[in-house]
A protein has these predicted regions:
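ATP/NTP-dependent adenylation/nucleotidyl-transfer catalytic domains that generate, transfer
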Residues: 1-46, 56, 60-64, 68-74, ...
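Conserved G/P- and acidic residue-centered "switch" motifs that form tight phosphate/ATP-binding loops
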Residues: 51
Length: 283
């Protein structure tokens, strides 16, 4: 008989709680260390979608580097909502950071016209990768480092476009679950209009993250925390979770493992990059 996990719901939620003030200090120190100390770069550039993840990263960058050293890029497509643009502007106004708006419609549609019957998923991936192309090009123009904005829940669930959202070399919120992103955002003063709206990639009308994933962020975070702690599905269900949701989350984690790694290299020597050739900073 399987043992019942000694982790009632309130203990699981307690494990997800963060010390927001301490987390802010650590993440701003992390950004200063990664940019200024390790790379000798003083400026950051990030895509600002109007969502909570990029909003929080903008706040962290402004605190770490000073608002004068943070450059946001809004990259709307023709189907992007005006609300998203307005919310991005709220962040710019609140922080006093620089911001450019670069339309990606012509670039995306120019490719899609030559593509073979692009479905909504392919279209969304093209949009995400085009935004990353713009971000890296603008980083070269500005002499600024691109900063990632993906959270841990999305990364574990594989809910991101490979070689797009995961591409920037530094990500201050990649180890924060979505519920922790909400908590830190409230602590740092991100506008409530951004915090309280339903999370959406804004790739098509009426699309929401939770609708795409098939589970709420709160439920996903609770289940993910137990999966990462090593509990089996039956043990997690014994706490009170729906077994179908547990299986959905685990399936997403296991089927997208490849997205969280660099491309697999065939080893033909004892000095393969990222396998044997590692510097101390890589450990």
């Amino acid at each position: 008989m399987l043992p019942v996990v000694d982790a009632p719901l309130h203990r699981i939620d307690a494990a997800l709680k963060i010390d927001a003030a301490l987390t802010e200090r650590w993440l701003t120190a992390f950004l200063r260390d990664e940019l200024i100390e390790r790379r000798r770069i003083t400026k950051a550039v990030l895509g600002l979608s109007g969502g909570i993840d990029s909003a929080l990263v903008a706040f962290l960058c402004a605190r770490a580097l000073g608002p004068e050293n943070v450059h946001a890029i809004r990259m709307p497509y023709r189907t992007s909502s005006q609300d998203s643009l307005d919310d991005a502007q709220r962040i710019v106004d609140a922080l006093g950071i620089k911001c450019d708006t670069i339309e990606i419609t012509d670039a995306v549609d120019g490719y899609l016209r030559a593509a073979h019957e692009p479905d909504p998923r392919r279209r969304g991936n093209v949009m995400a990768r085009m935004r990353m192309l713009v971000l890296f090009d603008q980083s070269a123009r500005l002499g600024a480092l691109p900063i990632g904005t993906g959270n841990k829940t999305e990364r574990m669930m594989g809910y991101f476009t490979w070689h797009a959202d995961d591409t920037p070399p530094v990500n201050p919120i990649g180890d924060l679950f979505k519920t922790q992103v909400w908590a830190l955002s409230r602590h740092m003063g991100v506008p409530l209009e951004v915090i309280d709206k339903p999370p959406s990639a804004d790739l098509e009308a009426n699309q929401t993250d939770e609708g795409d994933m098939g589970v709420t962020y709160l439920t996903a975070d609770r289940i993910l925390s137990q999966i990462l702690a090593g509990y089996r599905d039956e043990q997690i269900a014994a706490v009170g979770f729906d077994l179908r949701e547990i299986e959905l989350v685990r399936r997403r984690v296991e089927s997208t493992h490849w997205k969280r790694h660099l491309p697999t290299t065939a080893l033909v020597s004892g000095t393969a990059i990222n396998e044997f050739y590692l510097r101390p900073v890589d450990y």
